[in-house]
């Protein structure tokens, strides 16, 4: 099964907690604090793998979590950093942040990597908090929480040439004729429901990768049917072979088909519409006279400088000449580099610990937020040293000043989660 889009949840590892420990050795009565720092949590890293061709694996597993860092221990022993979690994705995968739709990375080359969530920093052990006036700190920091987010993976095929056209015009037959690809072929609409890749190997020509894109229908650029999913796969191609059914056996006009497909390409992306097109008038073996082809060719050439070939994928007529022109055109076009504008990029915000101050009906001032959770997790407010450190942090972070601005007075109660104290200026 070909899967070209997936949404997954990723969470990096939490940092390990710092240790509260005191040196206790024979003959060392005043050893002091010796708690070590916690280890860093594991990152989650996506890496492109040329051996993968689909995002099918992400249909079965959608949640990925890296390991937490190890906690610190006595004797200033640092906790071990967790190993990073590497997740393989196909080359050509675009990574987007799900909530914003912004691009995090475009993994177009072998072994391209991107860190999608960073592991949390390890907490500091109590040995770090010893000072001349605080010689036996009875608290340590917890590890920082890891990052988490949902990301979208979109696979855009890496092909030199894209075969485009309405359903049932013979694209799959052309691909099977010029390569070893074995796409499903039958005489009904939407036979191809997934892109197929093949390497065109024609004697005397440089090989190139060609993609059979499922048939585009009217309204594809607006998402009708599977239009947007199909169009995405030709964004990276350098040349388009526009396949037309010249026979008209299904009652469609070849010229009108040409105009309609180009309208869909233009609506989806002007750059895509402006890409070099070589026109392949297929199923010529079903046309008794050349007049139909010549009339079609004359109309198309009035629209622009198009190279037009009369071919039959069934009999092989004109195929080598068509591929020779494709090879010649490719030689003049550099490999497409995907440009990502800065405004389209997802740039993770620096993690900040915030708080807000509310006042309840009974007059109690409530301070809540991620800052409060982290602070209370890092100190033992039941110990004198911990309580003093707690107050210093509130003062340094501006919480005390903000409480005063909110109108707090001596004797008012302040609550941070489950911890309450009486305010004294």
Curated annotation (Swiss-Prot):
Name where it mostly resides: cytoplasm
- Positions of the Obg domain: 1-158
State its cofactor: Mg(2+)
Write out the residues that bind Mg(2+): 172, 192
EC number(s) from the headed UniProt entry: 3.6.5.-
Name the keywords, alphabetized: Cytoplasm, GTP-binding, Hydrolase, Magnesium, Metal-binding, Nucleotide-binding
According to its record, what are the GO cellular component terms?
cytoplasm
Domain called OBG-type G: residue spans: 159-331
Q: Which GO terms describe its molecular function?
A: GTP binding; GTPase activity; magnesium ion binding
Q: Which InterPro entries match?
A: G_OBG, GTP-bd, GTP-bd_Obg/CgtA, GTP-bd_prot_GTP1/OBG_C_sf, GTP1-OBG_CS, GTP1_OBG_dom, GTP1_OBG_dom_sf, OBG_GTPase
* Localization terms from the record: Cytoplasm
Q: What range(s) does the OCT domain occupy?
A: 345-425
Taxonomy, superkingdom: Bacteria
Q: Report the enzyme's class at the first EC level.
A: hydrolase
Q: Which CDD domains match?
A: Obg
In which residues is GTP bound?
165-172, 190-194, 212-215, 282-285, 312-314
Q: Which GO terms fall under biological process for this protein?
A: ribosome biogenesis
Per UniProt, what is one Pfam family of this protein? DUF1967
S-S bonds: none
Q: How does this polypeptide assemble, per the annotation? A: Monomer.
Give the family per the record: Belongs to the TRAFAC class OBG-HflX-like GTPase superfamily. OBG GTPase family.
Biological role? An essential GTPase which binds GTP, GDP and possibly (p)ppGpp with moderate affinity, with high nucleotide exchange rates and a fairly low GTP hydrolysis rate. Plays a role in control of the cell cycle, stress response, ribosome biogenesis and in those bacteria that undergo differentiation, in morphogenesis control.
This chain belongs to the protein called: GTPase Obg
Q: What organism does this protein naturally occur in?
A: Clostridium tetani (strain Massachusetts / E88)
Q: Corresponding gene?
A: obg
